Amino acid sequence: MIIKNKEVKDILIKCGWQESRTANISHYLDWYKKYNFKPFDAVPDFLSCFGGLTLRIPSYRYMKRISSPKNNSDLELEVIVNPAFFITDDFSSEDIIESKQYAKDIGDFLGIENLIPVGSSSEYEEFFMGIN
């Protein structure tokens, strides 16, 4: 994948990414199948480029503000590109149903038919891809 923005590219490279990166995503595809998610074409492409990486994204707020954050952890957001954090092996069947409904509800709210989990943050935020 070609990233044209130098600042974004530098951040990705610091996190272990490279333009020629092609990660083995078979375990992610197995996970989607296990939980009956139907990823569209862009999802495997995205995971092939970024799957397994932990991205440390600088907080734009503190890049532009004069004041400093209360905690150094506020200086960046850590995003783990791994859909399997959305539903883990220790989830009960009720947890799985609730998680899948949560993804559907978000998609419905945003007007997105097929919302697919792709990662999470250290702050327990989920990241999705979708098409509309």
Regions flagged by a language model, labelled:
Residues 1-125:
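A surface-exposed partner-binding patch
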